[in-house]
Amino acid sequence: MGPRGLQLLAVLLALGLCAPAGAQKPSACQCSRIEASHRKNCGFPGISASECFNTGCCFDSRVPNVPWCFHPLPKQESEQCVMEVAARKNCGYPGISPQECASRNCCFSDTIRNVPWCFFPILNQDCHY
């Protein structure tokens, strides 16, 4: 194999290692509920929408001077519970159990400290992407 072939092989291997296996296209709520100023880059300059989605990221080129290919918000049990941490409105009390939170028809996520773990859901109607 010549030098060009080795270069191509190296690029293909690098791209294959960067893309998560079986990456799933994020939901509309995971992409549209993140403030443009909070986007974390997930691609490279000139990435296409399909390349971006194939890595499991969101793509939106309507906002200038922010990443167009960006990491989605974390997946939740319900789309109504997908939101930025700053958007959470407390629906419980410190130490509330997931079961008690669910009995209040609220969302529960204890993965981030010092924020409400039991919080009110958001209507899916505002998911536009």
UniProtKB/Swiss-Prot annotation:
- What's one Pfam family here? Trefoil
**Signal peptide positions on this chain:** 1-23
An example of a Gene Ontology cellular component annotation for this protein is:
extracellular space
The segment(s) forming the P-type domain are: 29-73, 79-122
| Keyword Ribonucleoprotein applies | no
**Gene Ontology MF term list:** CXCR4 chemokine receptor binding
Source superkingdom: Eukaryota
Disulfide bond sites: C29-C127, C31-C58, C42-C57, C52-C69, C81-C107, C91-C106, C101-C118
The chain residues annotated with the modification Pyrrolidone carboxylic acid are Q24
An example of a Gene Ontology BP annotation on this entry?
chemokine-mediated signaling pathway
Give the record's keywords alphabetically.
Disulfide bond, Pyrrolidone carboxylic acid, Repeat, Secreted, Signal
According to its UniProt record, where is this protein located? Secreted
Q: What does this protein do?
A: Inhibits gastrointestinal motility and gastric acid secretion. Could function as a structural component of gastric mucus, possibly by stabilizing glycoproteins in the mucus gel through interactions with carbohydrate side chains.
Q: Report what the protein is called.
A: Trefoil factor 2
Phylogenetic lineage? Eukaryota, Metazoa, Chordata, Craniata, Vertebrata
Its encoding gene is what? TFF2
